[in-house]
């Protein structure tokens, strides 16, 4: 099931995972040497894995639409899955990669905007597989985090800028973000967005 959904992304995921784990193990070794500690090869990798994390989530969603403009009702059964890896901070840098898949369950009696079933009302949850997030963050500036790459952006209550979290295909942004928290009770952010990956998927 996982390979069928994420198969074409697994080489990318494995490559990024290997690089991040290698940097984590090297960082752990350097830290141990600087503090006069001794760490075995096995211990270095265990320490690296503990400091980082693979994550997985799945969300089933059902939406029914009764629209008087159509002779048929829409019934959309979909499942969203995320598979990702988030690193700890090493040399001031952390990284994240996340794959996303949206699958229709059953007959797909709804217009997803990409499936051609225009005789049904619209439920904007098209089937899609993509790299949802992949970014690096720099943490060595006091009270500041600089993030570059594909990322989630949710400002305030997400009314104007957000991830459209109630839909299955999450909206993400290819962007540069500088977030500063040096002032009490005030957060400052500069965001440059190159591209918006909308909820309608790659085919729309």
What are these regions (language model features)?
Residues 1, 83, 188-190:
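Intrinsically disordered, low-complexity segments enriched in small/polar residues
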Residues 1-40, 44:
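Cleavable N-terminal export/targeting peptides
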Residues 116-121, 156-164, 171-173:
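Short acidic, glycine/Ser/Thr-rich loop/turn "cap" segments at secondary-structure junctions
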Residues 8, 16-19, 23, 37-38, ...:
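Intrinsically disordered, low-complexity regions
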Residues 31-38, 142-146, 165-204:
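Signature for the C-terminal beta-barrel architecture of outer-membrane proteins
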Residues 28-153, 176-181:
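Beta-barrel outer-membrane channel/assembly domains of diderm bacteria
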Residues 66-72, 108-113, 157-166, 198-204:
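Outer-membrane beta-barrel translocator domains and adjoining extracellular loop/strand segments
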Residues 58-62, 148-153, 159-163, 188-195:
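Transmembrane beta-strand segments that form the barrel wall of outer-membrane beta-barrel proteins
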């Amino acid at each position: 099931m996982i390979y069928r959904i994420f198969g074409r992304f697994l080489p990318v995921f494995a490559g990024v995972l290997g690089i991040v784990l290698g940097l984590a193990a090297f960082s752990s070794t350097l830290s141990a040497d600087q503090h006069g500690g001794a760490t075995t090869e096995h211990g270095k990798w265990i320490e690296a894995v503990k400091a980082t994390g693979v994550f997985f989530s799945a969300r089933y969603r059902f939406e029914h639409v009764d629209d008087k403009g159509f002779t048929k009702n829409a019934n959309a059964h979909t499942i969203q899955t995320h598979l990702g890896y988030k690193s700890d901070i090493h040399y001031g840098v952390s990284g994240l990669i996340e794959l996303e898949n949206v699958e229709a369950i059953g007959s797909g009696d709804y217009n997803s905007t990409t499936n051609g079933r225009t005789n049904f009302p619209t439920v904007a949850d098209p089937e899609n597989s993509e790299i949802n997030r992949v970014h690096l963050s720099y943490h060595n500036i006091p009270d500041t985090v600089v993030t570059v790459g594909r990322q989630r952006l949710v400002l305030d209550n997400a009314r104007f800028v957000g991830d459209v979290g109630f839909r299955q295909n999450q909206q993400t942004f290819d962007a540069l973000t500088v977030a500063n928290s040096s002032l009490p009770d005030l957060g400052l952010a500069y965001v440059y967005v190159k591209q918006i990956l909308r909820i309608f998927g790659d085919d729309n």
